[in-house]
Amino acid sequence: MLPQRIFFTGVPGSRWSGIAQTLETIPGFNTSDRTAERTYNHHSYSGHKGAYFGWGMEFEPIVLWNNPDHIDQAWTEPGGTRLVKSHNWPDKFEKIEKRFPDDWIMLVYRPDQAAFAWWHEAGGFQIKYPDYSWYVDSNTMMYEIARSNKLMLDYACQKHATWNYFTTDWIKENFGADIEVSTIHSDILVTLIK
Protein backbone atom coordinates (compact mmCIF):
# COMPACT_ATOMS: atom_id res chain seq x y z
CA MET A 1 0.00 0.00 0.00
CA LEU A 2 1.30 3.43 -0.93
CA PRO A 3 1.82 6.08 1.76
CA GLN A 4 0.11 9.46 1.90
CA ARG A 5 3.39 11.16 1.00
CA ILE A 6 6.76 10.32 -0.50
CA PHE A 7 9.42 12.90 0.32
CA PHE A 8 11.36 12.92 -2.94
CA THR A 9 14.79 14.44 -3.48
CA GLY A 10 17.71 14.69 -5.84
CA VAL A 11 20.28 17.38 -6.52
CA PRO A 12 19.76 19.91 -9.31
CA GLY A 13 20.67 18.17 -12.57
CA SER A 14 20.06 14.65 -11.24
CA ARG A 15 17.17 14.24 -13.71
CA TRP A 16 14.94 13.56 -10.73
CA SER A 17 12.03 15.45 -12.32
CA GLY A 18 11.75 12.87 -15.11
CA ILE A 19 11.76 10.10 -12.51
CA ALA A 20 9.08 11.97 -10.53
CA GLN A 21 6.88 12.29 -13.60
CA THR A 22 7.24 8.57 -14.33
CA LEU A 23 6.28 7.69 -10.75
CA GLU A 24 3.27 9.98 -10.92
CA THR A 25 1.82 7.85 -13.73
CA ILE A 26 1.33 5.04 -11.21
CA PRO A 27 -2.37 4.70 -10.35
CA GLY A 28 -3.09 6.29 -6.98
CA PHE A 29 -0.69 9.23 -7.29
CA ASN A 30 -2.18 12.68 -6.81
CA THR A 31 -0.97 15.20 -9.43
CA SER A 32 -3.39 18.01 -8.61
CA ASP A 33 -0.38 20.15 -7.62
CA ARG A 34 0.33 20.78 -11.31
CA THR A 35 -0.42 24.24 -12.66
CA ALA A 36 0.89 26.33 -15.55
CA GLU A 37 2.90 28.41 -13.05
CA ARG A 38 4.52 25.26 -11.66
CA THR A 39 5.81 24.04 -15.01
CA TYR A 40 9.14 24.43 -16.81
CA ASN A 41 9.94 22.89 -20.20
CA HIS A 42 13.37 22.59 -21.80
CA HIS A 43 14.65 20.93 -24.96
CA SER A 44 12.21 18.15 -25.83
CA TYR A 45 11.64 17.35 -22.15
CA SER A 46 8.68 18.23 -20.00
CA GLY A 47 11.15 19.52 -17.41
CA HIS A 48 9.52 20.35 -14.10
CA LYS A 49 5.87 19.77 -13.17
CA GLY A 50 4.01 20.32 -9.92
CA ALA A 51 4.88 21.88 -6.58
CA TYR A 52 8.53 22.10 -5.59
CA PHE A 53 9.35 22.81 -1.96
CA GLY A 54 12.46 24.84 -1.22
CA TRP A 55 14.09 28.02 -0.04
CA GLY A 56 12.58 31.05 -1.72
CA MET A 57 9.77 28.96 -3.16
CA GLU A 58 6.01 29.04 -2.69
CA PHE A 59 6.40 26.28 -0.07
CA GLU A 60 9.49 26.67 2.11
CA PRO A 61 10.66 23.61 4.10
CA ILE A 62 10.87 25.47 7.42
CA VAL A 63 7.09 25.89 7.58
CA LEU A 64 6.53 22.14 7.40
CA TRP A 65 7.64 21.43 10.93
CA ASN A 66 5.26 23.99 12.41
CA ASN A 67 2.31 23.15 10.17
CA PRO A 68 2.35 19.83 8.29
CA ASP A 69 -0.89 20.84 6.55
CA HIS A 70 1.25 23.36 4.67
CA ILE A 71 2.48 20.47 2.53
CA ASP A 72 -0.97 19.37 1.51
CA GLN A 73 -2.00 22.90 0.46
CA ALA A 74 -0.03 22.35 -2.75
CA TRP A 75 -2.64 19.83 -3.94
CA THR A 76 -6.13 20.92 -4.94
CA GLU A 77 -7.68 17.45 -4.64
CA PRO A 78 -7.72 15.20 -1.55
CA GLY A 79 -6.44 11.66 -1.38
CA GLY A 80 -3.82 9.74 -3.27
CA THR A 81 -0.09 9.62 -2.77
CA ARG A 82 1.65 12.97 -2.96
CA LEU A 83 5.20 13.20 -4.27
CA VAL A 84 6.65 16.00 -2.12
CA LYS A 85 9.63 17.25 -4.14
CA SER A 86 12.52 19.31 -2.77
CA HIS A 87 16.26 19.67 -3.30
CA ASN A 88 16.39 20.65 0.39
CA TRP A 89 15.27 17.36 1.99
CA PRO A 90 18.84 16.02 2.56
CA ASP A 91 19.15 18.52 5.43
CA LYS A 92 15.86 17.31 6.89
CA PHE A 93 15.79 13.50 6.77
CA GLU A 94 15.64 13.00 10.54
CA LYS A 95 12.92 15.63 10.94
CA ILE A 96 10.91 14.03 8.14
CA GLU A 97 11.17 10.61 9.80
CA LYS A 98 9.99 12.00 13.15
CA ARG A 99 7.19 14.19 11.83
CA PHE A 100 5.94 11.80 9.12
CA PRO A 101 6.78 8.27 10.33
CA ASP A 102 4.36 6.51 7.96
CA ASP A 103 5.60 8.28 4.84
CA TRP A 104 8.50 7.23 2.59
CA ILE A 105 11.67 8.99 1.49
CA MET A 106 13.03 8.49 -2.03
CA LEU A 107 16.51 9.56 -3.12
CA VAL A 108 17.83 10.08 -6.65
CA TYR A 109 21.62 10.10 -6.95
CA ARG A 110 23.73 11.33 -9.85
CA PRO A 111 27.45 12.15 -9.52
CA ASP A 112 28.24 15.78 -8.77
CA GLN A 113 29.86 16.85 -12.04
CA ALA A 114 27.29 15.08 -14.26
CA ALA A 115 24.43 16.68 -12.33
CA PHE A 116 26.05 20.12 -12.43
CA ALA A 117 26.60 19.88 -16.21
CA TRP A 118 23.03 18.71 -16.90
CA TRP A 119 21.54 21.44 -14.71
CA HIS A 120 23.41 24.05 -16.79
CA GLU A 121 22.33 22.34 -20.03
CA ALA A 122 18.69 22.41 -18.86
CA GLY A 123 18.89 26.17 -18.34
CA GLY A 124 20.88 26.75 -15.16
CA PHE A 125 19.95 30.02 -13.49
CA GLN A 126 17.64 30.80 -16.45
CA ILE A 127 15.27 28.01 -15.32
CA LYS A 128 12.00 29.73 -14.44
CA TYR A 129 10.63 27.00 -12.15
CA PRO A 130 11.66 26.03 -9.56
CA ASP A 131 13.54 29.10 -8.36
CA TYR A 132 17.30 28.50 -8.05
CA SER A 133 18.23 32.05 -7.01
CA TRP A 134 19.09 31.07 -3.42
CA TYR A 135 22.10 29.15 -4.81
CA VAL A 136 23.47 32.59 -5.88
CA ASP A 137 26.14 31.43 -8.38
CA SER A 138 27.68 28.37 -10.06
CA ASN A 139 30.32 27.89 -7.35
CA THR A 140 27.65 27.74 -4.65
CA MET A 141 25.54 25.43 -6.83
CA MET A 142 28.46 22.99 -7.25
CA TYR A 143 29.16 23.11 -3.50
CA GLU A 144 25.48 22.43 -2.66
CA ILE A 145 25.25 19.58 -5.19
CA ALA A 146 28.30 17.89 -3.64
CA ARG A 147 27.06 18.53 -0.08
CA SER A 148 23.54 17.22 -0.75
CA ASN A 149 24.84 14.16 -2.59
CA LYS A 150 27.07 13.33 0.37
CA LEU A 151 24.16 13.75 2.79
CA MET A 152 22.04 11.40 0.66
CA LEU A 153 24.80 8.79 0.42
CA ASP A 154 25.42 8.98 4.18
CA TYR A 155 21.71 8.67 4.97
CA ALA A 156 21.25 5.71 2.62
CA CYS A 157 24.26 4.00 4.20
CA GLN A 158 22.88 4.63 7.71
CA LYS A 159 19.56 3.06 6.61
CA HIS A 160 21.28 0.14 4.85
CA ALA A 161 19.44 1.16 1.70
CA THR A 162 20.28 -0.42 -1.63
CA TRP A 163 20.87 1.77 -4.68
CA ASN A 164 19.45 0.59 -8.01
CA TYR A 165 18.96 1.81 -11.54
CA PHE A 166 15.51 3.29 -12.14
CA THR A 167 13.93 0.52 -14.23
CA THR A 168 10.56 -1.01 -14.96
CA ASP A 169 11.48 -3.93 -12.68
CA TRP A 170 12.45 -1.58 -9.83
CA ILE A 171 9.09 0.19 -10.06
CA LYS A 172 7.25 -3.14 -10.03
CA GLU A 173 9.25 -4.39 -7.04
CA ASN A 174 8.77 -1.21 -4.99
CA PHE A 175 5.38 0.10 -6.14
CA GLY A 176 3.67 -2.99 -7.57
CA ALA A 177 2.98 -1.25 -10.88
CA ASP A 178 3.85 -2.08 -14.48
CA ILE A 179 5.19 1.26 -15.69
CA GLU A 180 7.65 1.33 -18.57
CA VAL A 181 10.90 3.22 -18.09
CA SER A 182 11.93 4.13 -21.62
CA THR A 183 15.49 5.29 -20.86
CA ILE A 184 17.82 3.95 -18.20
CA HIS A 185 20.70 6.27 -17.35
CA SER A 186 23.85 4.48 -16.22
CA ASP A 187 24.87 7.34 -13.93
CA ILE A 188 21.56 7.70 -12.06
CA LEU A 189 20.62 5.56 -9.06
CA VAL A 190 17.56 5.52 -6.82
CA THR A 191 16.67 4.15 -3.41
CA LEU A 192 13.50 4.12 -1.35
CA ILE A 193 13.36 4.25 2.44
CA LYS A 194 10.05 2.97 3.80
Named regions from a protein language model:
Residues 80-183:
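PAPS-dependent sulfotransferase catalytic domain
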Residues 65, 154, 190-193:
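Compositionally biased amphipathic helical and low-complexity segments enriched in hydrophobic
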Residues 1-76, 182-187:
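PAPS-dependent sulfotransferase catalytic core
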Residues 177, 186-192:
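Structured mid-to-C-terminal alpha-helical surface segments
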